[in-house]
């Protein structure tokens, strides 16, 4: 997003080489905890940088999707404390999760937690757009873009906001 194409391409090549080693040689999945990073590895490297990821693309997935699929297949089970305090959670779907179509997995995992009272927020951009909202000259615009989301969060009376994107998390915390 800052025009450093050559540096980005070199880093992407290093990343994909490491991913290929994990996937092709060791048979391991590659799990991301960031929707943006996962989307970049799977879809943006080929699209923006011309780096072929087709041989490993399907082995790169979001951790919540991976965990959900383990639970659904019976390969893992969840246990919860019976005395856990109730927590009101508002879930924000990041823009890249919309693109991946994977918000379902995070939402369903949150629903599995008995002590969670979940509110799924209407899908709205938080305004951060990677590093865009961190730049002084873009701050006001970034906040204006996210204003509707921030109002939604306040209206829920939630204790916690959950999201699958660290930059969305930072924007929400700052606002």
Where would I find each of the regions flagged by the language model?
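Iron-sulfur cluster-binding electron-transfer modules in prokaryotic oxidoreductases
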Residues: 1-175
